[in-house]
From Swiss-Prot:
Keywords: ATP-binding, Kinase, Nucleotide biosynthesis, Nucleotide-binding, Transferase. It catalyses: dTMP + ATP = dTDP + ADP. Belongs to the thymidylate kinase family. One of its GO terms (cellular component) is cytosol. One of its GO terms (biological process) is dUDP biosynthetic process. InterPro entries: P-loop_NTPase, Thymidylate_kin-like_dom, Thymidylate_kin_CS, Thymidylate_kinase. This is Thymidylate kinase. ATP binds at residues 10-17. One of its GO terms (molecular function) is dTMP kinase activity. Phosphorylation of dTMP to form dTDP in both de novo and salvage pathways of dTTP synthesis.
């Protein structure tokens, strides 16, 4: 069985983390040799950067600082975690990757998406995902889910208003148009179990 690099993307409240947990279980049951990781984070240094970027109390962070910190964390994640796993024949399942920077920082912060893309391509070099699953849900539905989920850890980006999250969604649409060959859009208004089964079926096709 070949190894591929898979990413999960979606706006806040899309159920991505829940689906990732279910996928972890289903992929294990299917006998897939893989690791599950996340961004920002995924390596000891990158997790420290995550705490800075997402920490409540860092609201004064400049948008370009945010882009550069996340790109730096991503570089370390690629070098320390993702590439070694792929080289060892393990599939990588990652909760968020470069596309999140394009949507959240590029579009959400009204920055030049091409510049954000170039910074990230410099960081990751040739380590692009083979397959990206975009969990598609309206911004207002996602934010309502966040508000209803009292056990969810709320980070600095969750506290942004609906306008910001709508910009993020528009940004994702631009990213999908940039890389249509690797994206699969998944209806995230369905149950986490239904979403997981849809994604798992496609993963098995990709690995065949």
């Amino acid at each position: 069985m070949k190894a591929i690099f898979i990413t999960l993307e979606g706006p806040d409240g899309s159920g991505k983390t829940t689906v990732g947990t279910l996928l972890n279980q289903k992929m294990t049951e299917a006998g897939i040799d893989f690791i599950k990781t996340r961004e920002p984070g995924g390596s000891p240094i990158s997790e420290k950067v995550r705490n800075i970027v997402l920490g409540i109390g860092n609201e004064e962070m400049d948008p370009k600082t945010e882009v550069l910190l996340i790109a730096g964390a991503r570089r370390q994640h690629v070098v320390e975690t993702i590439r070694p796993a792929l080289a060892a024949g393990k599939t990588v399942l990652c909760d968020r990757f470069m596309d999140s920077s394009l949507a959240y920082q590029g579009a959400g912060r009204d920055m030049n998406m091409e510049q954000v893309l170039q910074v990230n391509l410099y960081a990751i070099e040739d380590t692009l995902p083979d397959r990206t699953y975009y969990l598609d849900v309206p911004a207002e539905v996602g934010l309502a889910r966040i508000a209803a989920n009292k056990g969810r850890e709320v980070n600095r980006l969750d506290k942004e208003d609906i306008t910001y999250h709508e910009k993020v969604q528009a940004g994702y649409e631009k990213v999908i148009n940039m890389f249509p060959e690797r994206f699969m859009r998944v209806d995230a208004t369905k149950t986490p179990e239904e979403i997981t089964e849809t994604i798992l079926a496609d993963i098995l096709r990709q690995l065949a």
